[in-house]
Amino acid sequence: MTTPNTGMPIKRKTLEKIIELKNLSKIFGKTTVVDDISLNIVRGEFVTLLGPSGCGKTTLLRMIAGFETPTSGGIYLEGKDVTKIPPYNRNVNTVFQKYALFPHLDVHGNIAYGLKLRKILLPEQEINEKLEKLRQKKSEEVVAKTEERLRTRTRLYTKKEIKAKVNDALKLVGLEDYGHRDVDSLSGGQQQRVAIARALVNEPRVLLLDEPLGALDLKMRKEMQAELRRMHKELGITFIYVTHDQEEALTMSDTIVVINDGEIQQVGSPQAIYDKPANAFVADFIGESNILSGIMLGDNLVKFLGKSFNCVSKGFAKNQPVDIVIRPEDITVHVKKSTKTQLNGKVISNTFLGTFFEVEIEVNDGEYQFTVQTNQNIALDAIVGLEIKPENIHIMAMEATINEIEAEMTAGDWVKIAGKEFEVTPQNDANGEEFGKGDRVTAFIPFDKIELTDDENDGTVGGWVTHTLYKGSYYQVKVWTDNDTLFIINTQYEWDINDRVGIKILPTDIRIQAREDLDVG
């Protein structure tokens, strides 16, 4: 069980933003990788961009760094538009998973490399010394003009300055005595520290870290997580960290930005993301969750698994479909009869995980299988009672209740959806008129009216499974087609992410409506 970072939260609305992303998008070919993202990053925060592989988080980081140019939108660093400014002119540095150290240079040489090329403004002490000498010979008018020129003059670092800065960087990453070492003689963790020192030695405003611990073993990753938190606290600069590892995000971050399919799903503190996920994707991706479908019966009352439960959620419409999240550690198991029991179930597995037992409990004759974390060692096949307190039932509005897909009428009663044509039941627009060729429409297809097949040729449309969510009596599967159309399917069968599938749709299950009618409604 992962414990979120619960350190003092940063009040994001009251602090100065250092980076502002405005309506940022990136399209490669026909694929939208980052889709209209807007985000403010507060100065001094440790921000983690978290999401599954291919969600767009690394592309977003590369655009902030300047290695990718946005298709649209803007990037602002300390209020300045840097969207088209090259990486070397942005005051940010990047640490990659592949360390990219120079094998022909020792540790000191690797860290010093950038310093040797960088020009700096004259230090204040140098300016004052030059002006003091000048005052002994020249008028104040000459001194003032000279000072103006000196304050814009640049020079390279001296060898003494480079040595001092490299030593400071080595000390920061815990490698004080390693300057003379060949980089090939270092362990993976030590090489990563050198890469971090090289990025920090130039004193960037922002440090970008692209899955920097991915190549390390578990023990080394844990150590480096603690080291990065220490460095961040000591330096006080902004860290933007990319990972797909939710444990890293929960334990290291001030703020987590959850990304999926190129869009931000939620922004918040680790505690808020864990306790109050914005949608089913976030709940499923962050930690372990029991996710069910339910109906709101009214304020503080929800129905799922055929029973009514008290909750602490208000403001939903009566009979509104909702997603329900219950964390495994928030369910109490009663091995003896109890008046507090709300559901009865059968233990079908029990695994000891060091500090707790993870128990799978089947309820309602297999309608749903709860994952429960408990300190009780419960026998297999035992019949137990489950208690769920109102404050532990988290209610979320469903992301969608039906597929709504942009489509176009091609001729007569034929409609083009995801690049394929379907002959649908004759339908009229809001004025009672028949649809004509070229009319823009929205196609509505229920989740449970679509069938998936593992033979793409058996389907009408082909696509890739990008997300699978267990919801008890069914799995909810997301499939993106090759022309970037999303279908959500409720199915009895579990599908793996990255499965290539065929999608079967019966024309009789398609309802169409003019898009302008929807806009008016």
Where are these regions (language model features)?
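Glycine/charge-rich catalytic "coupling/switch" loops of P-loop NTPases
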Residues: 2, 6, 303-350, 375-406, ...
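Conserved ABC transporter NBD signature motif
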Residues: 73-81, 128
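Internal alpha/beta loop-helix hairpins
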Residues: 233, 238, 243-307, 329, ...
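Short coil-to-beta microelement around the adenine-binding A-loop and adjacent beta1/P-loop entry
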Residues: 31-32, 177
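Helix-to-loop junction immediately C-terminal to a conserved catalytic motif
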Residues: 65
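ABC ATPase nucleotide-binding domains
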Residues: 46, 106-126, 137-143, 149-281
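The feature captures the beta-strand-to-loop junction immediately N-terminal to the Walker
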Residues: 50-52
